[in-house]
Amino acid sequence: MNIKLLDKITPLEQDFAKWYTDVITKGNLATYGVLKGNIVFMPNSYGIWENVQSNFNKIIKELNVKNLYLPTLIPESLINSEKDHVQGFAPELITVEKVGDKVLNEKLFLRPTSEVLFAEYFKTQLNSYNDLPLLLNQWANVFRWEKTTSPFLRNSEFLWQEGHTSHYSEEEAHQFSKKMIQIYANFFEEFLAIPVIIGQKTESEKFAGAHTTYTIEAMMKDGRALQSGTSHYLGQNFAKAFDISFKDKDNSKSFVYQTSWGISTRLIGAIIMVHGDNRGIIMPPKIATNQVDIITVFANKNPEVLQKANDLFKTLKNDFRVRINDSNKSVGFKAAQSEIEGTPIRIEIGPEDLKQNKVILIRRDTQEKIDVKIDELKSEIFSQIEKIHENLLMQAKRLLNEKIVDVEDYESLKKEIAKGNFVRVPFDGDKKEEEIIKKETFATPRCIPLNFIGETKKCIMTNKETKRYVIFAKSY
């Protein structure tokens, strides 16, 4: 193993923030762009996003969701149509005021999200109740001028999918928004090996212009939360602001009920901080850019090794995302590079292995080395992909379960937040009480967990009896 190469990564126990940026830069995941807050998604990270797209598209198409693409620029008059919405994004809006030397008559904004653009589109597509529901999604880039930036977590430009739907009834729309947050939770477990907490945002934390916001919250290795996906029930807020109406069964005019929902390239940051170690990122095998690295040993002096490696590549590439490293660099260097870049499975083949008609399979997550007969390699890789996924998920679940703590008073909350835990408390306060907690602990209300039913207790801030529980944590 090339220890010098691995030494470039700061130990996560020593400095988690520095470890995170080291993993990104040394793992060829991203490099900084020409503007503050912008990054270049290098092939090693963009491949993750491509695999997310491929797998998530299959899921939403089963729901009859259709993909489309809307323009990037939003006129000022349009974005001002929904007051709460524009106020929520005002500090982050990037404005276009000139084209060449000509000052525009109306300011244009780079989309921070696309609710208003979808609203205008829905207006042109809906005439009768027979046109409902209309279920749409776009894969796009969005722009938000963040004050504090961090690669993948907070960027001035990032990638996401945003689904937008219009429905006939309140019940149908509300249920669809709940269905999507559950789909996100399932997707994170099934493809990213990341367990999440499903919950509802408090009033102060919900999406600007939404009636209700549902969220999935993931726990990073340092105990901080990462909001990893949201689903919003918009009610008729945008429908009435933009006159998105249809002719009902009795020929009367009715307004639609709407939802919006999205995940973004933040999930790449989640993968790093949930699964990574001091050797670099560990990519979950089902969405890994490369699932298998084939590494040759002494191939420069043994042409038969190179030939067999190429044969294996041709055999495996139809079932897995495979790359081959047949360079003349040392085996230790090639192995370390594979580890830093997070490839789940490494296959090493040298002249001694050929004599025994086998290869050595190394798991990125456990460092376990397994001798595998060449004719059994494909089935073994399928098996190991499942085992690696289950191991990553199990470890992440264990951490999440260990670091969710229940307390019943404010002093205990402060102590547990300081330890880096998710703290679940009886809480019926509002923004005022939330701000006090944030000021004194730097923790925010992550969500009202949907899958937790607690006993009636006294709120830790107001002392009133409540059945509502809220999880507080520091977050990214």
Curated annotation (Swiss-Prot):
Q: Name one GO molecular function term.
A: ATP binding
- Keywords, sorted A to Z: Aminoacyl-tRNA synthetase, ATP-binding, Cytoplasm, Ligase, Nucleotide-binding, Protein biosynthesis
Is Membrane among this UniProt entry's keywords? Answer: no
The record ties this protein, via SMART domains, to: ProRS-C_1
Q: Which residue ranges traverse the bilayer?
A: none
Q: Does the keyword rRNA-binding apply?
A: no
Any one biological process term the GO annotation gives: prolyl-tRNA aminoacylation
Report one GO cellular component: aminoacyl-tRNA synthetase multienzyme complex
Q: Report the catalytic activity.
A: tRNA(Pro) + L-proline + ATP = L-prolyl-tRNA(Pro) + AMP + diphosphate
Q: What class of enzyme is it?
A: ligase
Where found in the cell? Cytoplasm
Using the chain's own numbering, where are the disulfide bonds?
A: none
Listed EC numbers: 6.1.1.15
Subunit details: Homodimer.
> What does UniProt say about this protein's domains?
Consists of three domains: the N-terminal catalytic domain, the anticodon-binding domain and the C-terminal extension.
NCBIfam families assigned to the protein according to its UniProt record, in alphabetical order: proS_fam_I
Family per record:
Belongs to the class-II aminoacyl-tRNA synthetase family. ProS type 3 subfamily.
Chain's role: Catalyzes the attachment of proline to tRNA(Pro) in a two-step reaction: proline is first activated by ATP to form Pro-AMP and then transferred to the acceptor end of tRNA(Pro).
UniProt protein name: Proline--tRNA ligase
Annotated source species: Mycoplasma mobile (strain ATCC 43663 / 163K / NCTC 11711) (Mesomycoplasma mobile)
Gene coding for it: proS
